[in-house]
């Protein structure tokens, strides 16, 4: 760990980083190297939800509907929030539940804002079943979700705009933005 990263870790004081953004934005693939560089633990909230439910997210949606999934997601987020020094890859819709924001803001919220065209390409190439895109027009569904969630994601402490950067490059960008946020937490940062 470099001296700068060690200093950053000390200044974070154990506060967790919560990565938010649309499905396919790279929260998990960015979160792993970010956690490793900071010497933090890494948690994929969706994986914890699946473990808690004993089934996949599409199965949870099918069995309990979106409302049931969101309730479980909030419970899992509260459990994760009891720990410190984590990088947490959240689910794409975590920001839609007002009760989640108190916990998210106990740490530092980082929005991975993927350029819409790039996001569509990523999701088309990904074999993961996305319950909210199981419609006749997935592109229209994605655009509707983006329009609904953008103002919510914009409440993040840091925004990192992503086009074709690798997850490691995105993690490095977050590490470069964090010191200025810690100096002046009233200023949201965008890269």
Swiss-Prot record:
Its EC number is 2.7.1.71. One of its GO terms (molecular function) is ATP binding. Its cofactor is Mg(2+). It is an enzyme of class 2 (transferase). Substrate binds at residues 46, 70, 92, 149. It is found in: Cytoplasm. Mg(2+) binds at residue 28. Its main location: cytoplasm. One of its GO terms (cellular component) is cytosol. It catalyses: shikimate + ATP = 3-phosphoshikimate + ADP + H(+). Binds 1 Mg(2+) ion per subunit. It comes from the Bacteria. HAMAP family: Shikimate_kinase. Catalyzes the specific phosphorylation of the 3-hydroxyl group of shikimic acid using ATP as a cosubstrate. Monomer. Belongs to the shikimate kinase family. This is Shikimate kinase. It comes from Parasynechococcus marenigrum (strain WH8102).
């Amino acid at each position: 760990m470099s001296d700068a990263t060690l200093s950053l870790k000390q200044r974070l004081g154990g506060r967790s980083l919560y990565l938010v953004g649309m499905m396919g934005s790279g929260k998990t693939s960015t979160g792993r190297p970010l956690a490793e560089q900071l010497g933090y633990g890494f948690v994929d909230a969706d994986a914890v939800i699946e473990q808690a439910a004993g089934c996949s997210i599409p199965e949870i949606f099918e069995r309990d509907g979106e409302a049931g999934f969101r309730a479980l997601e909030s419970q899992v987020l509260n459990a994760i929030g009891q720990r410190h020094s984590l990088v947490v890859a959240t689910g794409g819709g975590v920001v839609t539940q007002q009760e989640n924001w108190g916990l998210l803001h106990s740490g530092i919220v980082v929005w991975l804002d993927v350029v819409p065209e790039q996001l569509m390409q990523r999701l088309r190439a990904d074999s993961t079943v996305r319950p909210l895109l199981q419609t006749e027009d997935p592109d229209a569904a994605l655009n509707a979700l983006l329009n609904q969630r953008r103002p919510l994601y914009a409440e993040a402490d840091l925004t990192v705009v992503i086009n074709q950067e690798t997850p490691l490059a995105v993690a490095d960008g977050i590490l470069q933005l964090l010191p200025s946020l810690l100096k002046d937490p009233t200023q949201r940062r965008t890269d």
